[in-house]
């Protein structure tokens, strides 16, 4: 394992499994293509799992949490203390993702990379204590390189635990007051896009608040403009600990051969960073939904991603990806359990 492990090769998709799964789809008792994207996603999962009939019995959800120094600029509708409070809610079973994980029978892990709440120690939470949140990126780099690499490794470690537990699908979620500001800034820097196109209300800012948020991002982009061509340094300049952990998790999944279901805007920006760092990881990423945050559509289009759902979500936590899991499971069930024309003694072409 090299020091810059995130640049290591990604696993190859099993092309034989893809071909055989596609051939099976042609033999199932239905008109070819009549199940639409349920067919293509089952074939895609076959290639990622290396088996003609993929299954999604074991789903792992990691929630990465971290606070953001840029909140000092007044860019969020909620106080920073909410990040630490939500950690308790996650492990107590009261958060949306907690309910979804229970209903899906998924393993839920909560990782605190660094919040402003001092000496936070909660049973059931992994506290990595990288720092008391990031620094204010409108005035300097959000994190040091050492902190950034620790956050990347934190994401990778979650994936290694998931793989050891037999996970067939990895979902990363996030919690961090101020993190839509960080994600918007990152996306603007990487895509060289107008700030107003990628900046939205987050957890509930009004129009005046969104305008102020955009102005803060403009200042930060000007401050860090010289390093905009370096995706990793841009992540460290403008990102959050939890965003860096997501980047590390997505890259580790591609290297370890675990399929990823990407959640909303913040997670999709993390996916964009991951693809910029190691383009081969893109094959391992599926996208759960298109959310309400205005920048989400643009980042999805840049990645050539077709999300499974569009429900106007803007919660985060991995919730949109979790909601798409039943759809993926049913796609696998249809693919694996439907009869072929030969098995059912049904004519496979019109009279």
Swiss-Prot record:
Does the keyword Glycosyltransferase belong to this entry?
Answer: yes
Q: What is its EC number?
A: 2.4.2.21
Protein's UniProt keywords contain Transferase: yes
Q: Which GO terms describe its biological process?
A: cobalamin biosynthetic process
Q: Which residues form the active site?
A: 317 (proton acceptor)
UniProt keyword terms in alphabetical order: Cobalamin biosynthesis, Glycosyltransferase, Transferase
Pathway given in the UniProt record: Nucleoside biosynthesis; alpha-ribazole biosynthesis; alpha-ribazole from 5,6-dimethylbenzimidazole: step 1/2
Q: Return one GO MF term.
A: nicotinate-nucleotide-dimethylbenzimidazole phosphoribosyltransferase activity
Q: Which reaction does it catalyse?
A: 5,6-dimethylbenzimidazole + nicotinate beta-D-ribonucleotide = alpha-ribazole 5'-phosphate + nicotinate + H(+)
- What does this gene product do? Catalyzes the synthesis of alpha-ribazole-5'-phosphate from nicotinate mononucleotide (NAMN) and 5,6-dimethylbenzimidazole (DMB).
What the entry lists under PANTHER family is as follows:
NICOTINATE-NUCLEOTIDE--DIMETHYLBENZIMIDAZOLE PHOSPHORIBOSYLTRANSFERASE (PTHR43463:SF1)
Give the family per the record: Belongs to the CobT family.
Q: What is this protein called?
A: Nicotinate-nucleotide--dimethylbenzimidazole phosphoribosyltransferase
Q: Give the organism, scientific name.
A: Pseudomonas fluorescens (strain Pf0-1)
